[in-house]
């Protein structure tokens, strides 16, 4: 049985990686989330980092948001070009999994060709 998790090599893990994407990434707003996208420098694999502030809600709400986003990204990852993405919530509501998957699949490739830095 295969593990249905997002592998460690598909995640942004270090602060340096998050800062690079935040500074150099193109901002793209979807209905449920805000994305920062930058083309991958070294590989064709996509990586994701998720940031959720304490303003979003209590720990169980923040953790649920992260689980939903990780799973949606895991499903669409094979169809994405090599990029690094930082995802943050918009508003305080939990995302809908199917809608979020569609948004990620649509918005990430849109943001990549124009990977110059832009404000949200």
From Swiss-Prot:
Role description: RNaseP catalyzes the removal of the 5'-leader sequence from pre-tRNA to produce the mature 5'-terminus. It can also cleave other RNA substrates such as 4.5S RNA. The protein component plays an auxiliary but essential role in vivo by binding to the 5'-leader sequence and broadening the substrate specificity of the ribozyme.
The terms under GO molecular function for this entry are: 3'-tRNA processing endoribonuclease activity; ribonuclease P activity; tRNA binding
Catalytic activity, as annotated: Endonucleolytic cleavage of RNA, removing 5'-extranucleotides from tRNA precursor
Q: Name one GO cellular component term.
A: ribonuclease P complex
Record EC number:
3.1.26.5
Report the source organism: Chlamydia trachomatis serovar L2 (strain ATCC VR-902B / DSM 19102 / 434/Bu)
Among Pfam families, the record links this protein to: Ribonuclease_P (PF00825)
This protein is called: Ribonuclease P protein component
The gene behind this protein is rnpA
A biological process (GO) of this protein is: tRNA 5'-leader removal
- Is RNA-binding set as a keyword in this record? yes
- Which lineage do the record's taxonomy fields give for this organism? Bacteria, Pseudomonadati, Chlamydiota, Chlamydiia, Chlamydiales
**Protein origin, superkingdom:** Bacteria
What family name appears in the similarity comment?
Belongs to the RnpA family.
PANTHER family (UniProt xref):
RIBONUCLEASE P PROTEIN COMPONENT (PTHR33992:SF1)
Q: Which Gene3D superfamilies match?
A: 3.30.230.10
**Binding partners and assembly:** Consists of a catalytic RNA component (M1 or rnpB) and a protein subunit.
Q: What UniProt keywords apply to this chain's record, in alphabetical order?
A: Endonuclease, Hydrolase, Nuclease, RNA-binding, tRNA processing
Tell me if Cell membrane is a UniProt keyword of this record. no
Query: What HAMAP family has UniProt attached to this entry?
Result: RNase_P (MF_00227)
